[in-house]
Amino acid sequence: MADATEKAEHDRIFKKFDANGDGKISAAELGDALKNLGSVTHEDIKRMMAEIDTDGDGYISYQEFIDFASANRGLMKDVAKIF
């Protein structure tokens, strides 16, 4: 379970990725956010969406994001440094 600081960091990153503020991250929003990390291909985005979007609705919900973040703490620390 994440502590309060980690939760706040996850919230901040989720909001950064959720550009339109609708509470979910679309493939387009994911791609736009990942451009800050360097070159990312359409295939990279599709692969990430398939991995993180566990219910297959085409969006990354907050819970799916948190589940992914909890399972990938090292990656999330790197992402937090950039965002």
UniProtKB/Swiss-Prot annotation:
PROSITE patterns registered for this protein in UniProt: EF_HAND_1 (PS00018), EF_HAND_2 (PS50222)
Keywords: Calcium, Metal-binding, Repeat
CC terms in the record's Gene Ontology section: cytoplasm
Keyword Calcium carried by entry: yes
Positions bound to Ca(2+) 2: D53, D55, D57, Y59, E64
InterPro entries: EF-hand-dom_pair, EF_Hand_1_Ca_BS, EF_hand_dom, EF_hand_pair_protein_CML-like
UniProt-listed Pfam families: EF-hand_7
Residues annotated as binding Ca(2+) 1: D18, N20, D22, K24, E29
Any one GO molecular-function label of the UniProt entry: calcium ion binding
Domain EF-hand as annotated: residue spans: 5-40, 43-75
Entries under SMART domains matching the protein: EFh (SM00054)
Tree of life domain: Eukaryota
Function: Potential calcium sensor.
Protein name: Probable calcium-binding protein CML28
